[in-house]
Amino acid sequence: MSPALAAGLQIAAVVIVLAAAYVPLGDYMARVYASPSDDDPSDDAGSESNGTGGGTALRTRTRPRTDSRVESLIYRLCRVDPRAEQTWIGYSLSVLGFSAASVLFLYVLQRVQGVLPLNGGLSGVSPSVAFNTAISFVANTNWQSYVPETTMSNLTQPMGLAVQNFVSAAVGLSVAAAVIRGFVRVRVGGELGNFWVDLIRGTLRILLPLSFVIALILLTQGVIQSFSAGFASTGLDGSSVTNALAPVASQEAIKELGTNGGGILAANSAHPFENPTPLSNVVEITAILLIPVALTRTFGTMVGDRRQGLTLLAVMGALFAALLAVTAAAEAGARGVAAEAAGAMMEGKEVRFGIPGSTLFAVATTGTSTGAVNSAHDSMSPLGGGAVLLNMLVGEIAPGGVGTGLYGLLVLAIVAVFVGGLLVGRTPEYLGKKIGRRQITLAALSVLVMPALVLIGTSVSVLLPSTTGYQGNSGDPGTPGSIHGFTEVLYAFASAANNNGSAFGGLTVTSDWFQTSLGLAMLLGRFLPIVLVLALAGSLVATKRTPPNPGTLPTHGPLFASLLLGTVVLVAALTFFPALALGPIAEAVQ
């Protein structure tokens, strides 16, 4: 089979599954996050006045399901009133409090794993690694500065890391639901919902069932599921090798579905125990994209105009397709001694996946906040590596992480509406809500968080003499080694600030500086935007909805999609072009 045909078949399989799941999954998630207060007749009138096709019919389709017995039991045990609503401040404090408790629990669990069951002879994790890992998994980044097989026990993996894979993804879904309510509701008190209800519903009704199905599919492909310590085998050179075993299938499913990315094995999805066949590779890519893509349908359903969701999906799809084309062309057309000897750019890639399966996975994992890898990104061609780096630098909105991609793109949509309003001399509006000074200020601050963390972290790191020894590639300024070394540092901070978790392997990040600085980048990159977008939703929910008029900029269709796409590209280009010119672009033209 030719590489072109293999690439086409894999892309077609992913697109077909995503298209089949788009409507049922998107509408199902809208029902999960629908609130009884959204059925208020005053809201229906508001939706109709906005001309979005909302009203009673829509509310009937999204009418919330009653709480299950399990959910009701959890509410009673945790003393949560599911009927209570929170303002953006209360919602933010709940998110931050829950995440802080999660960091503390995961840190302590790692430190004491040596005295707990199923430790496999492993001792407690060192303080710096435990700190970095706790923040990483709670922030949905899953950055791994350790070797999982020799660091984390078979109790820490499922009890600590896998649990965070579920709840960190559920936090992202909850925030996205709260932001959507900011557009849907009109509340003088500014209520956005109940974080604890959203968290529990997202975990029990969406993530757990889907993960169970995906885990079963992966088991049929040979992904392992075991609590044994491991087994010994003889390598090709005659030496004895210890092969680690772990409950991989159950964690692999939520690793991809929740756009987490942290592998239970060091080689991540390149390891045959995690991703053994081309079919399992397609399943994992589909799982990565499934919820972020369907959330655009959820958004359109909840706001009462599904064209809005399709417009966002078109922007996501255009960015994804463009970056996939660039990456695939760069990898397929790469030249050099190694590439010519192997017949293709196969360094760092698994033969069973080839270039098509590796590039599709790389673009999917960097276009979301997943960060899982089935190939070595550091071994990609300069343009290929630059493309996946750019995929993160545009904000991971193609299609973005679970929840984070949607609200990240909505923030950029508000910026695009504001720019469009300036062009025509009209007060900017989005879905009937006027975008004033407070709204655009919060949106701008949210957009600026990630670039500030990436550029400041990178510049300080490359200036510190103590970090030079941790760069696998270095040399005099302007030499190929120094250029690629700079790209490795830039990639690390882009990955951390965007809560991605993938890395260029040539950079050693076990020093106290990188453990701490990248940990802070993950922490601030996750929770500062969450607080800002919740504040934005709080200001929108208290804003009256205005009916459209002849001067209103339509926020659906090709015109607005082009405006939004241009805004995304312009913001990324103005912010990161100098850094990219010093890194992958300079490396490519040498």
Predicted feature residues:
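Membrane-proximal intracellular helices of multi-pass ion channels
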Residues: M1-Q590
